[in-house]
């Protein structure tokens, strides 16, 4: 199987640290080898802006910002229940709006554990090669 479309996904949409910079550098090198690369994130932010500045295709899943909060903000029982409901409805919304984007990629590279959690059902349904 010849890889033609690679989708990189990272949930840290407003970060440009080591992992995100490495992902952008790898995407640029793959583009030089005529591989179609897209960098996606859970929401628009610095990561997608930097990818666009480097002429890399971008895609935003536009997840609810409340679900993208850090773990310590879900310390109480109410917050944990809210998170579970938000996650469930985000899965449904992502399936309806974004499943096609995942399905058209030959390889899906997940850059962090949060992304894997946020997109777990969709990643399994695509039956595509998933790299973490």
Show which residues each predicted segment covers:
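Short, well-structured alpha-helical segments in soluble
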Residues: 94-104
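Short, well-ordered alpha-helices that flank and scaffold nucleotide-derived cofactor binding pockets
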Residues: 24-28, 32, 121
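Short His-centered aromatic/hydrophobic patch
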Residues: 90-91, 110-116
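Extreme N-terminal starter segment of soluble prokaryotic enzymes
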Residues: 2-7
């Amino acid at each position: 199987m010849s890889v033609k479309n690679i989708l990189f996904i990272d949930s840290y949409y407003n970060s440009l640290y080591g992992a995100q910079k490495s992902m952008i550098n790898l995407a640029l090198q793959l583009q030089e080898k005529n591989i179609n690369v897209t960098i996606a994130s859970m929401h628009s932010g610095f990561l997608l802006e930097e990818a666009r500045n480097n002429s890399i295709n971008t895609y935003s899943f536009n997840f609810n910002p409340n679900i993208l909060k850090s773990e310590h903000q879900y310390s109480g029982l109410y917050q944990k229940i809210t998170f579970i409901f938000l996650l469930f409805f985000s899965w449904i919304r992502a399936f309806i709006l974004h499943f096609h984007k995942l399905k058209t990629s030959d390889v899906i590279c997940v850059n962090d554990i949060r992304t894997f959690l946020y997109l777990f059902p969709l990643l399994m349904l695509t039956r595509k090669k998933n790299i973490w």
